[in-house]
């Protein structure tokens, strides 16, 4: 899937997916749960054999977490106009606490459905939405607190563990599964893969330390968890604007993002046909989709924040919930009394949602209607199992503004709202900054854990310096790795175009890979069981000059291969025992292998003297220390 030009149509995108999506040297495999319809996907990276003087030694396949859905399964034909298979439909029906509505409940949704001008844009295979039966609560938190382990929870447990426990008794994995002890900084990670059980997942969701964003109307979803005691996740953003783009382009952006490893997607569309764009994305997305409903509500007013009303916003929530949106960013913590605190900031209020609500509060001199109507919002959320992503509308937009009274005042209000949402058994995560220098990051994590009761933290970076426009995927990736280690559950990616323009596909790829690195570095630091397996496999391949395995085990095989081939394009270079950096005579790994081979050929006594000789040279060739 190397094409960078946007798809002109769904037909051309489907053709591209069928031909180019497959990962190199990989197979799509599934773990089956307690019932045959719990089929958890993972990717298995196949390795070549190690060549020795005694012959070839096989290297085992490496299982990795996979977010690509059916798009990477060669046995599945992708039909974007039909959408993905409804893998959760039966689970939801069996619970018998929802009902299929006779039609849409949202006034705006009905208007769009009945507008002849939008007929050519609509997803054709729509079914009527579901909603909780009267008096029912259908959230994963509600089930967890009742002691019920849902298929979604079992799915998550299998997905997080990758069934790695089955590898520990296999001799070919013994060296590869070695791992440095981590420092979880207070998190209660599973100690071994087998400790990641459905019951573990249930307890974490019941306590509010994790969420499973899974709207009952997003049946195509492959369930995943966001929580401090799970793998660190990343989010990718997409969305049209007033100047871009087609429906096919937006679906392509979603598929492109999950191909590189996005665990969730936020649709931040602000242009034309927001409703129809979101429908196409949801019906074809295997990962949770989040939105910022205030953006669409503002669009309905013609962009005039003062004209927003609770009734209009409520209708937007229902419209999006009935489409299947899994989590909403709600800026309910932007209170009237906090707005003046931003007056002396260098960059003021940088959140779009935060600035919209601040303007509304000042124009009406009233409290934020998202705050005053919060209980009513909770009633909507639990009827569809939409999770809260409580927005940080007052996040700092530069490091000079970090950790100020406005930011932390809002955070404490988000903690108050978290407790209120939990009274309704509604799932919650907390959004965080932003721009924070390294030495001030820990305070953000500490404040969130204390005041938001360990609800999952979801941060945008943070960027640790403001001097690098064009490289803010790096400035933020540094902060993301640190705050991920400290306990942040999900990292929102930043692309090289941050603060400069709308990212294209290559910018999205760059941002996602940067954040996959940050998330993985955090998992290693925390000591996630089995996290070092892929590192060890790649290191072994590097030492043995198995170039193809090095490429394929990496996060971006295409880039690794292209960099290597830029200077050594011949096929023979793929088995050469050197690269273009050192050349054949100065490769440290080749020299080390020669030393090992030489030492192995010596008699034992002589070998010992040879080892001492090498040790003497390595320590500086000094007789006296």
Swiss-Prot record:
* UniProt entry keywords in alphabetical sequence: 4Fe-4S, Iron, Iron-sulfur, Lyase, Metal-binding, S-adenosyl-L-methionine, Thiamine biosynthesis, Zinc
Disulfide cross-links? none
GO biological process per UniProt:
thiamine biosynthetic process; thiamine diphosphate biosynthetic process
Instruction: Quote the EC number.
Output: 4.1.99.17
Pathway-wise, it operates in: Cofactor biosynthesis; thiamine diphosphate biosynthesis
Q: Which GO terms describe its molecular function?
A: 4 iron, 4 sulfur cluster binding; carbon-carbon lyase activity; zinc ion binding
Checking InterPro entries in the record gives: ThiC, ThiC-associated_dom, ThiC/Bza_core_dom, ThiC/BzaA/B
Query: Mind naming one GO cellular-component term on file for this protein?
Result: cytosol
Residue sites binding [4Fe-4S] cluster per the record: 579, 582, 587
**Can you tell me which residues bind substrate?**
237, 266, 295, 331, 351-353, 392-395, 431, 458
Where Zn(2+) binds, per the record, is at: 435, 499
Note on cofactor: Binds 1 [4Fe-4S] cluster per subunit. The cluster is coordinated with 3 cysteines and an exchangeable S-adenosyl-L-methionine.
Record-linked Pfam families:
ThiC-associated (PF13667), ThiC_Rad_SAM (PF01964)
Recorded hits in PANTHER family, A to Z, give: PHOSPHOMETHYLPYRIMIDINE SYNTHASE, CHLOROPLASTIC, THIAMINE BIOSYNTHESIS PROTEIN THIC
- What family does the entry list? Belongs to the ThiC family.
Protein role: Catalyzes the synthesis of the hydroxymethylpyrimidine phosphate (HMP-P) moiety of thiamine from aminoimidazole ribotide (AIR) in a radical S-adenosyl-L-methionine (SAM)-dependent reaction.
Name of the protein in its database record: Phosphomethylpyrimidine synthase
